[in-house]
Amino acid sequence: MKAEASYIRGLALAVLAACSVAPQPAPSSRPAAQPTQAPRLKPGAVTLTIIGTNDLHGALERLPLFAGFVANVRAARAADGGGVLLVDAGDMFQGTLESNLAEGADVVRAYNQLGYAAAAIGNHEFDFGPVGPRVTPASAEDDSRGALKARAAEARFPFVSANLLDRDTGARIRWPNMPASAMVEVAGVKVGIIGASTESTPYTTMPVNFEGLTIAPAGPAIAEEARRLRGAGAQVIVVTAHLGSKCKDLEHPDDPSSCDRSEELFKVIGDLPKGTVDVFVAGHTHAAMAHRISDIAVIESYSSGRAFGRVDLRLAPDGHVTGEKIHQPQVMCGELDKPVPPPAACQPGDYEGRPVVPDPAVQQIVDSALARAAVRRSEKLGVTLAKRITKSYGTESAEGNWFCDLMLAARPDAQVAVTNGGGLRADLPAGELEYGQLFEAIPFDNRFAIVELTGADLRKLVSTNLQRGGAILSWGNLAAKARCKDDRLDVAITVGGRPLSDAATYKMATSDFLASGGDGLLGRLKLPDGAIKVTDVIIRDAMADVLRQRKGTIDPDKLYAPSVRRLDYEGARPVECGAPPKAGKPRAEANE
């Protein structure tokens, strides 16, 4: 898919209207601390609004309307003498046909127009690999971070990460426009913006594209950078980080008891001295937060451009923060538990006392990207879905099962197929299936890998996944029945209807992501050299070829139903036998 976009990479960015340009940042790569500067005094109190987005995943269609919301907030702050700071918490590009064709270039163009001040570096920012059609390096000359560096060069705002390090030297990376932090001035207020990346980055992107890098603990890195920025005169510190949590209750911002404390964000905040950070814009978990945690205002706003987060800080004339209002995520169109309406059907109403109007300049950027993708998107694949085919991250699903079946049809040399719940990104709607819909369900340009392993290895993969939380493994041509016996999990497995032989050798079709260490799937098996063979065939496109040949109607109820399960286990994952784990030691879970 990346080859289809090569012709647009040399286009120059449009000249932006002055009213939408972000405050010009002063990037930092941790130079020596500067002498403390006195806060700029103002004749009166000022309101600073921080708007946070996260995990856009290429959902360009949502940005013109979002720009309308931002414009209304900017107008309100301009009227009262305050200002607006717009930041993103990462995973900007990967996920839609219109974004992936240009390796995220149109997202950068739109963000430039919107006036972002900074963006965090998410794990999926590494997905595109080198500039060009390949998602991994083909030779030593290929830069496995080439596409990411190209997007940073085009951005009028920095990509910030304080904890992304060179593995060999232990020093922070020194790539153009990718500093640890930036300092901006908004309405006379000096704001330090610090970035951070999730500790799971090495195994939640293509591992080969992350070689030579490592992630340092985010808390100490943020604290060190905050001290430097405070010393340089920052009155407010904002963290934008591709790590987060999830909270069930958004009605009580001072009560985070409904939030998942096992997620990375709580450890990071726990490592920060009191008063280090004022606002924390989170991401990665595709969930919602609007809470005050350890005196830090924390926001996260789902994913795919459905909503945005907001914090209003009130600053005294001497520059110190006197209070804040944490807003719940502002859903811009439709309802969260229903499919997103098309932009033309959105009726956002008023916000900040005036109608929300999509921004025409952002709309022009989006329309251009959509037009390039339109022909490919609308291609009919020859099959009709009798009902919606749903995905699931943590449980067996019709979509996961179907995709594994299609993988086996494309690779008849394999006996089983496996994919991960994190790779399923969208449901498939009922009706004639189009390529664009398939793309959004499986947007990653992962290639086929064939893994030779023993039946004992397969049993370990199935058993381990059942006993862990996080992403489910979906299987093709494999069924398992798991029950607790004598305080241990007994798993009976069949392949092609026959009992699994622990001593036999099987060929497993999977993705190069999982085969190369993604999600930690194969790392514990200690497979011999030569057991993994990676091809140049993109899984999604091979699946599309199978569908074009098969045609017909697909019934999701035959792929998965309570009575048609490939993974038969009691209760919910993680399956536990015997005494439950001790309190205070939550299981680690993979994230989006």
Residue ranges, per PLM feature:
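Bacterial N-terminal signal peptides that target proteins for export
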Residues: 1-11
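C-terminal motif of bacterial Sec signal peptides marking the signal peptidase cleavage site
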Residues: 17-18
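N-terminal catalytic scaffold of extracellular/periplasmic and nuclease hydrolases
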Residues: 21-317, 321-322, 328-340, 392-404, ...
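Feature marks short, surface-exposed loop/turn motifs that line or immediately flank catalytic pockets
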Residues: 200, 245, 359, 363-367
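Acidic, Ser/Thr/Pro-rich beta/coil linker or hinge segments at domain junctions
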Residues: 332-361, 369, 373-379, 527-528, ...
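Glycine-rich phosphate/diphosphate-binding loops and the adjacent beta-loop-alpha structural elements
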Residues: 376-396
